């Protein structure tokens, strides 16, 4: 694990199934005396507990014209689980501006790399590549940083308000501001396999891109995911919901041919 942006960076499991994620997360969880940002928060997960009584929210625009058949199938499967599924909304905020806070932290972390010109050794040297984003961050003022911290707090309040209404949020990974916002607030996200689409090879994407358009070429059966976001320190409930949704979708057992 390499530190990029200390106030955002977090360690999480990457597994073939939801229950495996719960097992790995139970090992990762806990406070580390060498890490002053770690918290001694409990982690509770019971694979047999069930998910009755949960309230699941979704942003309508996330399932609009750009949503895929896999996205819609995942929402339909969530409805079949028997819990209440409701439309929700988030306040209008300049969520995208938070990227500048991330770039400033990353530039500070890799200051020595920039000042020594060792970033010239990095293979990717495009306009949107790290060497140039590090340098651009140096033009942010102290006033900019204070205002960005204020915005971050507003986003924290917005997501806390959302999860006061629902137990979890479902949607594609690029659901509204959620990928960016939840990174800055710490709200947990479970991204899981939901189905497959026939797609061509996609081009490389920058750190700020969530989706990239497929290029022309030979198409393959590519796995697609759906995301679940939940309350702070409530990963157990999120994983229980993911486990039930995984069973309803019935695609987790399909593995790539080697």
Regions found by a protein language model. Name each.
Residues 83-100, 134:
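Short connector loops at secondary-structure junctions
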Residues 46, 65-89, 110-121, 145-167:
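Acyltransferase
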Residues 50-59, 100-156, 201-226:
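Short helix-loop capping/hinge segments that flank enzyme active sites or metal/cofactor-binding pockets
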Residues 1-72, 247-258:
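A short helix-breaking turn/cap at a secondary-structure junction
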Residues 13, 222-234, 238-242, 246:
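Short, well-ordered beta-strand elements
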Residues 183-184:
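Short hydrophobic alpha-helices that are characteristic scaffold elements of the AMP-binding
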Residues 9-16, 135-140, 228-230:
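Short, well-ordered beta-strand elements within core beta-sheets of diverse protein domains
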